[in-house]
Amino acid sequence: MAWSTLVDPSPSVLTNPIPFPSGRGIVYVITDRRAAGERSLIDIVHAALRGGANAIQLRDKDVPARAMIALGEALLPLTRAAGVPLIVNDRVDVALALDADGVHVGQDDIPADMVRRIIGPARILGVSVATVEQAQQAARDGATYVSVGDLFGTPSKPDAGPPIGLTPLTEIARAVDLPVLGIGGITVANAASVVRAGAVGVAVISAVIGAPDPEAATRALCDVAAQR
């Protein structure tokens, strides 16, 4: 069955979405219940925002829409107060229900061009890519940014496949006129190499969500990501 038969392609307009951060030094934090353990994801995200995170992605592949919406409703006041966009992974329905600032999709999710038609021109659209061809297609589909990985191997996505390393990131950053983030196994120790390879910043899960002090961990990543 074609994707076009499953969704209404008419756009949804958000009056004042928070834009994707401009410039370099972006630290984009992705939520993960498993990495949080018994700690509150809301508290962790709040700490990350205090530490300087300038984009938050709500990601949870394993919970019903209602639970994801409930978490999003708790996070939105924090991100709005910080002037930071809240981007929903995969779930366009959840993003629209929340009036979130954007959606992020992978290569096996709803096609990016269809997501763009649904969410309208103002919201953020992120796409996961691993090759120049995928990044160029994302640009044609209306992506706001792309994330490139898995760079180093990550415990957060055991099905991500073998790490691709930094060379594809450099090639993608040269090939598309979009902000490029590195993702996959990024830590304070290797974040500088990601930025030197051409990324405008880093997307992280465990490095912040699983850190004993998420605020300090985010601040350290921000310091490294801002360096050239």
Curated annotation (Swiss-Prot):
Pathway: Cofactor biosynthesis; thiamine diphosphate biosynthesis; thiamine phosphate from 4-amino-2-methyl-5-diphosphomethylpyrimidine and 4-methyl-5-(2-phosphoethyl)-thiazole: step 1/1. Pfam families: TMP-TENI. Keywords: Magnesium, Metal-binding, Thiamine biosynthesis, Transferase. It is an enzyme of class 2 (transferase). 4-amino-2-methyl-5-(diphosphooxymethyl)pyrimidine binds at residues 57-61, 89, 128, 157. Its cofactor is Mg(2+). Its EC number is 2.5.1.3. One of its GO terms (biological process) is thiamine biosynthetic process. Binds 1 Mg(2+) ion per subunit. One of its GO terms (cellular component) is cytoplasm. Coiled coil: none annotated. It comes from the Bacteria. CDD domains: TMP_TenI (cd00564). Gene3D superfamilies: Aldolase class I. Disulfide bonds: none annotated. Mg(2+) binds at residues 90, 109. It catalyses: 2-[(2R,5Z)-2-carboxy-4-methylthiazol-5(2H)-ylidene]ethyl phosphate + 4-amino-2-methyl-5-(diphosphooxymethyl)pyrimidine + 2 H(+) = thiamine phosphate + CO2 + diphosphate; 2-(2-carboxy-4-methylthiazol-5-yl)ethyl phosphate + 4-amino-2-methyl-5-(diphosphooxymethyl)pyrimidine + 2 H(+) = thiamine phosphate + CO2 + diphosphate; 4-methyl-5-(2-phosphooxyethyl)-thiazole + 4-amino-2-methyl-5-(diphosphooxymethyl)pyrimidine + H(+) = thiamine phosphate + diphosphate. 2-[(2R,5Z)-2-carboxy-4-methylthiazol-5(2H)-ylidene]ethyl phosphate binds at residues 154-156, 185, 205-206. GO terms for molecular function: magnesium ion binding; thiamine-phosphate diphosphorylase activity. Belongs to the thiamine-phosphate synthase family. Condenses 4-methyl-5-(beta-hydroxyethyl)thiazole monophosphate (THZ-P) and 2-methyl-4-amino-5-hydroxymethyl pyrimidine pyrophosphate (HMP-PP) to form thiamine monophosphate (TMP). PANTHER family: THIAMINE-PHOSPHATE PYROPHOSPHORYLASE, THIAMINE-PHOSPHATE SYNTHASE. HAMAP family: TMP_synthase. This is Thiamine-phosphate synthase. It comes from Roseiflexus castenholzii (strain DSM 13941 / HLO8).
